[in-house]
Amino acid sequence: MKKLPLPARTYSEMLNKCSEGMMQINVRNNFITHFPTFLQKEQQYRILSSTGQLFTYDRTHPLEPTTLVVGNLTKVKLEKLYENNLRDKNKPARTYYDDMLVSSGEKCPFCGDIGQTKNIDHFLPIAHYPEFSVMPINLVPSCRDCNMGEKGQVFAVDEVHQAIHPYIDKDIFFREQWVYANFVSGTPGAISFYVECPANWRQEDKHRALHHFKLLNIANRYRLEAGKHLSEVITQRNSFVKVIRKYSSTATFQQLQSEFIEANLKPIIDLNDFPNYWKRVMYQCLANSEDFFRGI
């Protein structure tokens, strides 16, 4: 849901750093001979992902531990490249892993900054796409809920069931608003989030956004986050009204509403770098809700 800048390290840098951790010269030299193939596959990955067609990548199937995937490199060897090299605290490449883990500001891009990053997610799962086991643009900092839940277990076989790729996907998912909310009146009230994509989007893109939203349980997770914050906003609203009436007893409902929106809600609503951020959507919802301001 949230756009991330491309990884700081190139695939070439990653491959070279991993090779430094290989103690056997013949193993290292054999690995290095496959660099052109790895880089060719990365280019294919980039092209497909940028157009929402990553699901069409021709994966190796059937896939057993001894299946050859890249030249004479087997599935199990490529998986160990990640587990026993990139993640190994005693290997040179581990510094790259640690850098990636905090590259998103320790906030998970899949769920829109709700979760704290604790893992690296293989966007295309390593069990099915071992050739991308250490490719930086396939390694996304992720919270446990996103990484260990449905996102980490599945891969798409059609366009509409693809999750949104934080590094390289269509700009519409990051630059346009497609998450909205309603204020549910009560004591103290609640915020209900839903998907409403722009009318000019392709149906496939609308379905993708909705699928991502449902796959990662965004509605419930946004609702819980907003619920923690709503009582604070209500307190701010009540205090604001009290102070204004102290100095201007003739202030009308419309004036109080307008001034509170301008002073307290609009600064967050005007944030443009992440239009589907839960707090921005929540504040937008409150600004448009007569029920939220009823009784002030």
UniProtKB/Swiss-Prot annotation:
Superkingdom of this protein's organism: Viruses
Protein name stated in the entry: Protein ea31
